[in-house]
Amino acid sequence: MFVLSTARCTETRANKPTNHRRAEPDLTTSPRLLSSLLFSSLLSPLSTPRTRPSYNANAPSPSRTPMITLQSITDAVGLGSARYGGFQWSVALGWIGLVWYSTVTTVCALGYYKLWKHCLRRPQSSYCATAQNAPHVTVIRPVKGLEPHLYDCLASSFRQEYPRGKLTVCLCVSSRSDPAYATLEKLVADFPHVDARIYVEEEDPLLQPDHKPMYNLGPNPKIRNMSRAYREAKGDIVWIADCNVWVGKGVCGRMVDKLCGLGSGSSTEYKFVHHLPVAVDVTGVIGVDERRALETSGAARVKDGKSACAPGVLAMGGGRLEELFLSSSHAKMYTAINTVLIAPCIVGKSNMFRRSHLDYLTTTASCQFNPGIDYFSDNICEDHLIGDLLWKNRVREEKEDGKHLGKHALVFGDLAFQPIANMSVQSYIARRVRWLRVRKFIVMLATLVEPGTESILCSLYGAWGVTTVLAEYFQNKILSTWTTFFTFFGFSILTWCLIDWTVYIMLHSGKTVERDENTPSFARPPQGTTRRRFSHWLAAWLGREILAFPIWFWAIWGGMTVTWRDRQFRIGLDTKAHEIGGNSRAGLLEEQASGRENENEATSLITTAVKRQTRGNR
């Protein structure tokens, strides 16, 4: 790794002192020197030394009195010392690392401030909750199999404080053989005053084999479930929320207020509004009947990989990792980016927009699909693409009427709670890999730099910057030591950890939730000071931070296939999803055939669990 030059050898006189030799550098105490020598070994073949070594035939043999000296990169490639106007790679990289560290910590600080400002108090009541002229809202809930607390999550849409007659709930499922179908029927029966309907993909007229011309919808199973509900939606405003999301009873009104610029807040209208997702691991909390139903239906199995074969940390620890990820690093970055609004940042758990806007932007002569969400049926990451399309393009009101519309808005204070149970570590990894592989062709730059926003790598960048840039600027040898490097790194990790702990406490405090007798346990304030003990939380935090880079590396360089909703897809460079193993219709028929064996038993268990859970809530 070092550039060696043999100096001209001279005989040492016996009467001359020999204690004036040049001291060799200590590589163990200087990160900057080690980096210089490292780059020297890499770049020296590409450059010409300043002087060529000369050999004197009359000189004594080198074996008699050799003197070996080390040259840094600046001497080797002729760039000179930075102190004298030259250039050093270590300092250049140090500047990059220091600027990056400062930028990331500033963004995290902004996100932390916004969470502290909005997540420790209950949001105000919405204007639309009592307004007779409130716009009509169509709620679309795509359902796939059983999820923990499925009844509670879906029922939260029926319990919204919104003018009666101005809210329609659409429950979408692929087939009547889906284990969740009994739950959907019970919901419709339990809320007869709500305009609600169950949409079955198998019964969609456009998707029937005898339909002329045949409507060749893309392979995205979520879009296929929602397609008919979207086409037949009442009114202009559409609210799409995943089936495993629970929201408070005043959320719909506040979303409409933000979208339409109503109420006491800002009068700016937006094209797209959404919520911050928060996961809660409810493993061990759900009832026995519900757990048996989940296991029978297969929802407790790992959805994105092989099933966990034994209970324990690996079999059940994925839920804690997911809970921690959405309640720490993700929450800070998501909130900060949606505060400065430099780019679209969306997670498709709970989104609201206007049909007229999306239809206008997706009506093209070359598209083979209907306008609206069907336009994205060839893609997996449809939620991000919908938001991205509304962000980058002007709608009719902006073009023709000159109306000013905001791009996106996060409804601060309201959270989209997602209960999860029996998630293995392998399932968590597969989930993160799937998300990264889908995103890497959609937002490539953001995906490539994502590891640098995590605590470990970002702290390494900062430590490198301090021990190179600041050491060079202040001419302080102490700052350039490995002791300073690891001291800064350790202090940064400790500070990062404590900040994430307080973020977790704020998000799980339950102070933003409008509680009543129907509020489930996972959305209520914890019985103790915090939802998890610090030691348990710290173990999950360390596990997630350590896994962050390996997961990213495998997702980016380990392939282009993902598994979603029990189907395998290959993500192309055009960001489209290509189903592996046949077309979507064949995959659907195969899925239906494999699920009919346990249909009767699962339906019976589900019905029993739902009835007991409903009686318990009441």
Swiss-Prot record:
A motif (D3) lies at residue 383. The keyword Amino-acid biosynthesis does not apply. Signal peptide: none annotated. SUPFAM superfamilies: Nucleotide-diphospho-sugar transferases. A motif (D1) lies at residue 178. A motif ((Q/R)XXRW) lies at residues 431-435. Gene3D superfamilies: Spore Coat Polysaccharide Biosynthesis Protein SpsA, Chain A (3.90.550.10). InterPro entries: Ceramide_glucosylTrfase, Nucleotide-diphossugar_trans. Pfam families: Glyco_transf_21. Glycans are attached at N225, N422. The active site is at D383. It comes from the Eukaryota. Disruption phenotype: Leads to increased resistance to cell-wall-damaging agents, such as calcofluor white (CFW) and Congo red (CR). Impairs glucosylceramides biosynthesis. Displays growth and conidiation defects as well as and raft mislocalization. Finally, also leads to reduced neutral lipids levels and attenuated G.mellonella virulence. This is Ceramide glucosyltransferase. The gene is gcsA.
